[in-house]
Amino acid sequence: MKKQILLTAALLSATSMMAQKLTYPQAPKDGTIDTYFGVQVADPYRPLENDSSKATAEWVAAENKVTQEYLSRIPFRGKLLNRMKELANYEKVSAPSYIKSIGKWLFYKNDGLQNQSVLYIMDSLGDEKNARVFLNPNQLSTDGTVALKGIYFSHNGKYAAYAISRSGSDWQEFYIIDVKTGKLLDDHITWAKFSGASWQGDGFYYSAYDAPQKGLEFSNVNSIQKIYYHKIGTPQSEDVLFYQNPANPMRFYAVSVNEEETMMFLHESGAGSGNNVYVRDLRQPNSQFIQMTSNLDLQYSLVETIGDKMYFLTNDGAPKNRLMVTDLKHPGFSEWKTLVPESKDMLEGVTFVDDKMILNYMKDASSHAYVYSMDGKQLSEIKLPTLGSAGFYGEKDRKEVFYSFSSFTVPTTIYQYDLNTANSKVYAAPKVKFKESDYVCEQVFYPSKDGTKIPLFITYKKGLKRNGKNPVFLYGYGGFNVPLTPYFSSVRIPFIENGGIYAQASLRGGSEYGEEWHIAGTKMQKQNVFDDFISAGEWLIENKYTSKDYLAIVGGSNGGLLVGACMTQRPDLFKVCIPQVGVMDMLRYHKFTIGWNWAPDYGTSEDSKEMFDYLHGYSPLHNLRPGTKYPATLVTTADHDDRVVPAHSFKFAATLQAVNAANTPTLIRIDTKAGHGSGKPLSKQLEEQADIYGFILYNMGLKY
């Protein structure tokens, strides 16, 4: 009886907290008005774009205080976080990768709750017990906010260059390890961005920008990317400028050299996902780059080189991709030969292994894989465990094949595949503290507003009743040729085991069905994406999975835009909205860091009157209306996000707090020493997810 009374008292206290109207900090404002094609558009919270100003810093601190006080009073938040930690505390291992130049195997492992995964090295397969730590990113900072972005071994096996990022920023720094001694050398490269390291001799090529002005490191437009060559043992100030193209400042450039160091490739990409490729024969003294392709709207991905042959995955003439081959004597695209033609499914990747090829296709947003001969004939299918996502690993001159497999209820498992017997065996299986067989995952196809069938994955616990009272976490993205496929995340389990439903929609704008599917969700067809997502919510309600009182929508980055647009267009449909690191100001997004790179998907407010009108018509920031009742909203961003600058979320949250006519919380959670999401330490991830799921359940009147 006493326990019941205490529980009732706790619920009454929680209900009282929900009824209290929150008081929000006053955001800095000015009278800024922009004019687009004769149309005046006010931007009163423009001062929040200055993320290094004292006024912005004070507002951020005050907003975080309101948010943290609210979240800390959710009675079950601690219990939820503890369960998330329990579920995340399992050993996670990557597929092993053979490094030919050193004759050893590398793999990543996380013992459970380590903030960053550790890189291990072993002499041979099966020798995992004697594996040695090669690089432990957890030792690079006390709080786990320094992340390893990549490691690159020299072709002579003497050195390894590794890239790190700090606090989630896209800026990279390179350091060098002497492989034989394990000693860290004095070499240090700064202001690299969107860069790997490609070795030639005792040095490597990398891509960087000029050092930004102090105070604008995380907001200034990135232009004129340059390629440098760094010689080991020399200071960065002596690095040789290898390539730049000031005539096209808004392009990315990178160099790659094959492992035999016989070919060099220059990769050029503009705004969007297309690219051009140039090749140079390093065996010929004073040779120059030869242009292979000339269409920045299409993709040409170099997959492998074998002798003088070059293999490319491309959507040129094949919206769902095809595999093509050419050689140094016939580099121009018009002379390329189709090795594997386009099929009805999306070709995602090709792995060369032991005189064979493994082609990984996507069918209805799930992986299907096949073994091919080198002359392009299909030999067999690789049987995968269930609907899910697979990634393949192998080397052209070795027999070993590994693949990772994951689905909504299947934690990432590593398999070793035998090409001779066509059998898979488990190489590394995680042990998560939940019972996989207790859950159901189904895929349905629902009609969008225009009748297009959209794939929707729905995951829930067995025995769930479709009575319209189940909480739903509806997730989407819909853009930039990025597919949403099945994957495991332990933080969802507490929600699902408590009677929740996780729903994931594969919206237009992604690559689930090729380039046509992508284009159907871009520029002046972007509304299709929002219609797809809104229709998913309506379908779930119509089919009694949930109701408006239990429907939450969540999305990050372009998915944050998705949530922002849908909640402004249909505020009546959702109970809770979580726009994460979203693009909220569609009129000014291209004026920050690499926002210009998104123009092929979005268009810009300067393109034309028609494009401005279209963007203005759905831009989340510009479609918040005074007097409208909006759902409970938790906006998330981070102080070091230099991909989608936090000003988007700052201005959106400040405006929503000012106009919302409903007595619903409008909070913004601003993470510190964090960025767009990549490299975020596990401890920060779990804290954030406990806040998000706690906020959702609490504002639905539910508990955990």
Regions found by a protein language model. Give the residues of each.
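Hydrophobic beta-strand positions that form the internal "hydrophobic ladder"
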Residues: 105, 157-160, 204-205, 264, ...
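A conserved hydrophobic secondary-structure block that centers on an alpha-helix together
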Residues: 129-196
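A flexible loop/linker signature enriched in serine peptidases of the S9 family
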Residues: 110-117, 141-145, 164-173, 188-192, ...
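Cap/lid segment of the alpha/beta-hydrolase catalytic domain
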Residues: 138-151, 163-169, 183, 417-423, ...
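Active-site-proximal cap/loop segments of hydrolase catalytic domains
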Residues: 504-704
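Non-catalytic accessory segments flanking enzyme active sites
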Residues: 54-152, 163, 251-305, 338, ...
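Bacterial Sec-dependent N-terminal signal peptides
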Residues: 1-21
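Beta-propeller blade signature
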Residues: 121-124, 175-179, 221-233, 278-282, ...
